[in-house]
Amino acid sequence: MDKIVSPSKTKAIVEKYKFRFSKSLGQNFLIDQNILEDIVDGADIQPDDCVIEIGPGIGTLTQFIAEKAHKVVAIEIDRNLIPILKHTLADYQNVEVINQDVLKVDLHQLIADKFEGKPVKVIANLPYYVTTPIVMRFLEEKVPVDSLVIMIQKEVAVRMQAGPGTKDYGALSIAVQYYCNPEILLKVPPSVFIPQPKVESIVIKLQVYPEPKVKVERDDLMFALVKDAFGKRRKTLLNALSSGLLQLSKEIVRESLEAANIDENRRGETLTIEEYATLTKEVAARQ
């Protein structure tokens, strides 16, 4: 069938299937061809690439992805959209739609079963409430994907890319930048969606590193230190880390900071990932 990227075609499909938008699922459908093309261009899909699309909606973006990719597996949680997707994607033989929650899918098994060892990329339009759980699942579980191109709420994208010493720098910044290089591709105004969301969106590309940015033997300890350091942003590192969930003594914290050459009066938001890695090594040696 023809591309469905226009306000009139989108509305016609919604009316034909009597589809009701779910606020709880954050459903907003794109209606701007330029934005759709920019997303696909940003993903840099090669003819041999396979794509996992999360939240295909009515298949608007899926149609553009399918024209570039070797194969697309679109994971949609809303069963009411499945009949629509079967209709809008009927002409695309390289697309498979799965009606599941991506947080419950065995992603390693899916990739092994569906993609024949070919390169895998992720493209997604994620509502605010599941952005971090979905992104961190791919990264922490080391799901073998080359990149994630995701459309998310502006504030979350800014936090992912923020650097030390800025107001947006936090635990999410470090977690994302530990595993990948974040690059903001484009801003997306509310006017290019049906219905229009109340927030601005950003398309960000997370290029996954072959290995994490820094070498840390105990990344669980590093992220626990990060959580404690940012949990009490106004406190110095000495006070934040000695009164956090790790229950470290002031003596251990002071010795570890000194060995890592980090001033105990600094705050957590000023440390680089490399400094957190060094601090983790020193704390681990004293636990």
UniProtKB/Swiss-Prot annotation:
Q: What is its EC number?
A: 2.1.1.182
Q: Which domain of life is it from?
A: Bacteria
Sites where the protein binds S-adenosyl-L-methionine: 28, 30, 55, 76, 101, 125
Q: Name one GO cellular component term.
A: cytosol
Pfam families the record matches = RrnaAD
Molecular function GO labels = 16S rRNA (adenine(1518)-N(6)/adenine(1519)-N(6))-dimethyltransferase activity; RNA binding
InterPro entries of this UniProt entry?
A: KsgA/Erm, rRNA_Ade_diMease-like_C, rRNA_Ade_Mease_Trfase_CS, rRNA_Ade_methylase_Trfase_N, rRNA_adenine_dimethylase, SAM-dependent_MTases_sf
Query: Where is this chain's protein located in or outside the cell?
Result: Cytoplasm
Gene3D superfamilies hit by this protein:
Ribosomal RNA adenine dimethylase-like, domain 2 (1.10.8.100), Vaccinia Virus protein VP39 (3.40.50.150)
- Catalysed reaction(s)? adenosine(1518)/adenosine(1519) in 16S rRNA + 4 S-adenosyl-L-methionine = N(6)-dimethyladenosine(1518)/N(6)-dimethyladenosine(1519) in 16S rRNA + 4 S-adenosyl-L-homocysteine + 4 H(+)
Keyword tags: Cytoplasm, Methyltransferase, RNA-binding, rRNA processing, S-adenosyl-L-methionine, Transferase
Checking PROSITE patterns in the record gives:
RRNA_A_DIMETH, SAM_RNA_A_N6_MT
- The answer to whether the entry has keyword Isomerase is no
Role description: Specifically dimethylates two adjacent adenosines (A1518 and A1519) in the loop of a conserved hairpin near the 3'-end of 16S rRNA in the 30S particle. May play a critical role in biogenesis of 30S subunits.
Protein family according to the UniProt entry:
Belongs to the class I-like SAM-binding methyltransferase superfamily. rRNA adenine N(6)-methyltransferase family. RsmA subfamily.
Question: What name goes with this protein?
Answer: Ribosomal RNA small subunit methyltransferase A
Organism equals Alkaliphilus metalliredigens (strain QYMF)
